[in-house]
Amino acid sequence: MVKPGAHTSALGKAVHDTARKNGLTVIKNLTGHGIGRSIHEKPDHIFNYYSKWDDVKLKDGMVIAFEPFISNNEQEVDQSYDGWTLITEDSFVAQYEHTIIVSEDGPIVVTK
């Protein structure tokens, strides 16, 4: 799934399908992204759900921050008054992140 030529939408579909299978949902207003010399690079987003308009393809050598955000109820988070904390009205949210190098030889997870 993480290989040159693969669509980022396939990652989002896998995250969303896995969440639904387990009675959970995904946070739709937070995404993964490309990473490199800057904290946010191309691709600008890696959704946690499938979008038919998301036709971004992974390229060999690209580095991505894969960040699934899973919730037991809500699909969006809001920013708290402190300008930093993200909150929901009545849900728990979990997030896990891996930095992955896209390679012809297979994905290289660098955050093990």
Label for each model-derived stretch:
Residues 1-112:
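Active-site neighborhoods and metal-handling regions in enzymes and metal-associated proteins
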